[in-house]
């Protein structure tokens, strides 16, 4: 049972319903996290817009941003975000071996030096951000522009927020929408 209720499509304003419908079209569900945030429409709107800007704009590949999101979620022990973003990462071309290899990325041949620097940033920001040195930043900057560093930091920071929110609520992974929910939103179910 959820610690805080998750609002159904029928319980939100028409404006938020449009965002729910976009989630249903794009993902086949409305993430429980966002259904919980819907209790505060202003926060819901800004969080969905922020997530879109962080993950889907800029010059870095979304695959790389999702890779650091998965590592951040591993470090925070957030099953909810891990389930969702592992699936997204796999769809974007990350392999199951790479997902598993994130746990020992320093010794893994599965990641480029640029990817290792991004993963290191995820660990530093999540576990010991005050200790991230000028030398570490210079190593990161060998591979990424200032704007790209901002993109990485925004993804890592955003998911530290999302992870902690979901951990406190003991949020279970979002299930696919029912045929009824999809029909209500005018979304055709995907046939297997």
Residue ranges and their predicted role:
Residues 1-192:
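Hydrophobic alpha-helical segments
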């Amino acid at each position: 049972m959820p610690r805080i209720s998750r609002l159904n499509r029928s319980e939100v304003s028409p404006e938020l319903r449009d965002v729910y419908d976009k989630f249903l079209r794009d993902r086949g569900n409305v993430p429980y996290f966002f259904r919980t945030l819907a209790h505060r429409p202003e926060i819901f709107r800004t969080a969905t817009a922020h997530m879109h800007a962080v993950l889907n704009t800029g010059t870095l590949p979304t695959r790389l941003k999702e890779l650091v999101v998965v590592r951040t979620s591993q470090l925070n022990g957030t099953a909810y975000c891990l389930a969702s973003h592992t699936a997204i990462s796999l769809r974007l071309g990350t392999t199951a071996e790479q997902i598993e290899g994130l746990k020992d990325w320093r010794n893994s041949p599965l990641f480029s030096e640029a990817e290792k620097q991004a993963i290191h940033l995820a660990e530093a920001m999540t576990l010991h951000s005050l200790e991230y040195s000028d030398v570490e930043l210079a190593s990161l900057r060998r591979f990424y522009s200032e704007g790209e560093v901002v993109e990485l930091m925004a993804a890592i920071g955003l998911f530290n927020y999302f992870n902690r929110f979901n951990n406190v609520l003991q949020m279970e992974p979002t299930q696919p929408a029912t045929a009824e929910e999809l029909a209500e939103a005018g979304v055709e179910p995907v046939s297997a």
